[in-house]
UniProtKB/Swiss-Prot annotation:
Stated role: Plays an important role in DNA replication, recombination and repair. Binds to ssDNA and to an array of partner proteins to recruit them to their sites of action during DNA metabolism.
Protein name from the UniProt record: Single-stranded DNA-binding protein
Biased composition (Acidic residues): 248-264
Highest rank taxon of the organism: Bacteria
Organism field: Thermus aquaticus
Domain SSB: 5-108, 128-228
SUPFAM superfamilies named among the record's database cross-references: Nucleic acid-binding proteins
Recorded GO CC terms: nucleoid
Amino acid sequence: MARGLNQVFLIGTLTARPDMRYTPGGLAILDLNLAGQDAFTDESGQEREVPWYHRVRLLGRQAEMWGDLLEKGQLIFVEGRLEYRQWEKDGEKKSEVQVRAEFIDPLEGRGRETLEDARGQPRLRRALNQVILMGNLTRDPDLRYTPQGTAVVRLGLAVNERRRGQEEERTHFLEVQAWRELAEWASELRKGDGLLVIGRLVNDSWTSSSGERRFQTRVEALRLERPTRGPAQAGGSRPPTVQTGGVDIDEGLEDFPPEEDLPF
């Protein structure tokens, strides 16, 4: 089993002054909404920028320390992890993946270019949006092709985590998507295989057949590597490293799950 690795690094601008609240047990919760744009070169050699909006959650003493100090438009660095949560509401099982901050720090914004979106929210150009994961596949890869013939694969990744002071391991179930040559390479993997993923965090939203709005946070892979366990697994083809133009939508804050649907 691959060792668990779960890291998120973000640099973006605060779209609004953060909200702080408390659980019934007195735990402070500070929610930060960050916005930025990822820049990369697509297959045709053209430079593209894709906007993103991510909600980051800070708990405990750090939440109380920063609660009154942060303002809309500030440039913020976040180091954290992806956290999978599952709960039940009205007899229906629900789940979400959120960014849990371990550390945040305001950055100097001088010389950094921001723009305003259609809702008047500041968004940082050439932001940082990086996720590094290592875990094991929970199912065989699902390879498909778009009508234009572009390969795309969906992967389920289980990342085990044991944090200091915790006796039991916790498993985070995360979704990964890869495109083109990287997708075709990943399609040869099988359930249980270890995988190192380096990519960017994106939010999907869609309307189900029943008319419900659905949300999913996933990782779009920019690089995949197969961990080896001894000489027997050291061979095999090396995965391509690609810069993908797979996401082409303006993912807005309206795509976040409503607060009443969250566990606290």
